[in-house]
Amino acid sequence: MNSLVATPPVPPHFYEHSRFSPSRSMSTPVQQNSNRKRKAEDDGNDVDVRMSASPTNSPAFTPRPLPNRQMKRSRPNVSGRPLSLPRLLETLDTEALRSVLQAVCQRHPELGDEVVHTAPRPSVASTLQVLRNYQSTLQTSIPLGSGEYLSDYAYNRVKQHLFSLLEALSDFTPHFLPPNESQTSVSLTYLDGATDIIHGLPKWQTPRHNIGRDSAYEEIGKAWVLVIREAAKRGGGIQLQYGGWDQKLAKHNETSGGKLQDAVNELRNSLGWMGSSALPGAGASGGDQISIREQLLSGTYGMGMPLKVGPW
């Protein structure tokens, strides 16, 4: 009976307080909050936070130093000022630049020699283009409906442009003649183009108006003679023999009405018997006859001639 001592009953709530809870860190409330059920509005806020946060540990977004840009500072005071010389020259066209250069050389003559030695030598193509521009201006000023021989009215209309072209021819031609021009091919090429321009000069009903045209033919003929003589001294005139200048000069002489006959005679004397048959007045019956020089080059010289047999 002693062993069966009745133990007083213990209330259940005493057992709950008697349990020892483990030590909890300061992050336990955060963990408990993360284990609770999430609401829909909480998910949206978390996505925004994650997207806005920059991944500092991601290797794809390595921060790079930006280059230092030196921004041009604006001027504190804006005021008008003239253009610099390089900018001013950029705005000038060819005619304006030529006028400025001529005015400066006239005021300071010592600069003229400097410009002449600094500027490049004019080429045949550029010079002939200048002459063609003068020729085009002359032709466009001729009244419409004019025939082959123009009237005095047309002459008064175009005489200023005619004089400009003749003066340009007279100035440019000596530049391409020896001894100023040492290459014979350059001189001949210029004379060929300049003679074509003279062929295009208008003809006038009044004879005195044709004096300028006749004088141009006379000057260009003397230039041909000078260049032919100089070419004959170099290499036995090989430039004249293989350049076809005998045919070209013969055609120019025919177009001019025989005004270049002196040049034709000089070329005939320079070439001798090798090119004589291609020149007018040297026994050639027509323009289709092949010259002796061409026959020698092609190997057909002497074909069709009787061969003499027996003692000479």
From Swiss-Prot:
Segments crossing the lipid bilayer? none
The record's keywords, sorted A to Z, are: Cytoplasm, Nucleus, Protein transport, Transport
One GO biological process from the UniProt record? nuclear protein quality control by the ubiquitin-proteasome system
Q: Where is this region: Disordered?
A: 1-83
Which cellular compartments is it found in?
Cytoplasm; Nucleus
- Cellular-component GO terms for this entry: cytoplasm; nuclear membrane
Q: Which Pfam families match?
A: Cut8
Q: Does the entry feature the keyword Ligase, yes or no?
A: no
**Gene Ontology molecular functions:** proteasome binding
- Biased region (Polar residues) positions are 20-34
By its UniProt entry, which Gene3D superfamilies does this protein fall under?
A: Tethering factor for nuclear proteasome Cut8/Sts1
Function as written in the Swiss-Prot or TrEMBL entry: Involved in ubiquitin-mediated protein degradation. Regulatory factor in the ubiquitin/proteasome pathway that controls the turnover of proteasome substrates. Targets proteasomes to the nucleus and facilitates the degradation of nuclear proteins.
Q: Which family does it belong to?
A: Belongs to the cut8/STS1 family.
Q: How does it assemble?
A: Binds the proteasome.
**Identification of the protein by name:** Tethering factor for nuclear proteasome sts1
Source species of the chain? Talaromyces marneffei (strain ATCC 18224 / CBS 334.59 / QM 7333) (Penicillium marneffei)
Source species taxonomy: Eukaryota, Fungi, Dikarya, Ascomycota, Pezizomycotina
